[in-house]
């Protein structure tokens, strides 16, 4: 796989109220091209939108890829890179024996990751990272659309 096969993705989630109407956004860059994705849910949480952004971005790729995935959510990054193995081993329970929140999304995200080689990068939100700012704008657009504002 060459550098030109490398795909860079930024994802973000937003919520107006938590829970409340929310949106997700993703910016995908590859070989000089870009694709923007976004959507929303009228009743959700910020974490669910962060997770949905990753799932939708990865599922939009039509072949196994080498990806740098930029997220501003430590919940998403740590959940997939550190916590999920323990949750599965414990029957989807946390260390304090409580059910893992958003289990269906963790499972969908793990499945979406399987066919790709992913390097996870945490970026500070609202700190000038151009890709993150674009993903944030898309997530806000998704939120606005489910709230009936264009």
Swiss-Prot record:
**CDD domains xrefs:** RNase_HI_prokaryote_like
Which prosthetic group or cofactor does it need? Answer: Mg(2+)
Alphabetized HAMAP family for the sequence: RNase_H (MF_00042)
In the UniProt record, does the keyword Ion transport occur? Answer: no
Q: What is this protein called?
A: Ribonuclease H
NCBIfam families found in the cross-reference section: PRK00203.1
Record-level GO BP terms: DNA replication, removal of RNA primer
Query: Which reaction does this chain catalyze?
Result: Endonucleolytic cleavage to 5'-phosphomonoester
Organism superkingdom: Bacteria
Where is it found, in Gene Ontology cellular component terms?
cytoplasm
Q: Which InterPro entries does the annotation name?
A: RNase_H, RNaseH-like_sf, RNaseH_domain, RNaseH_sf, RNaseHI
Q: Binding residues for Mg(2+) 2, per the UniProt record?
A: 12, 136
GO MF, one example:
magnesium ion binding
Enzyme Commission numbers on file: 3.1.26.4
Q: Which UniProt keywords apply?
A: Cytoplasm, Endonuclease, Hydrolase, Magnesium, Metal-binding, Nuclease
Q: How does it assemble?
A: Monomer.
Pfam families tied to this protein = RNase_H
Question: Where is the segment annotated Disordered?
Answer: 129-150
